Amino acid sequence: MREFLESLNSRGIDYVIVGAHSLAFHGRPRYTRDLDILVRATPENAAKLVDLLNHFGFGDASFKESDFTEPERLIQLGRAPNRIDLLTSITGVTSDEALTSKVPAELDGVPVFILGKDALIRNKRAVGRPQDIADLDTLQS
């Protein structure tokens, strides 16, 4: 996972970490079986991402740029607990809002970008599962 994060940075891929890792950064660590990464859904960013995936040995999966330019796409790489989920959108927050809200952080010793707290709150509120409601209580306290 560390090498994948480093490659996102070195290739200039526009991304933000969302989900439980974002929640942990903002104060509520919770076990998770994956790393959720929202990627900007543009042709340029998608081309860089496909190149990265080919570099990591996912060439057999035949990823295309269009896999990362359409909204509401989810690409899962690997298996839990080290699975990486690549998303092109999240609920309740536009991709532009999410990527603009990102804050610098560190994960496994790698500089990364985490979803901002206000955007995370809007996302949790929009998803609305019982776990998300519990997360909101912590985030807003």
Language model regions located:
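Compositionally biased terminal segments of proteins
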Residues: 1-141
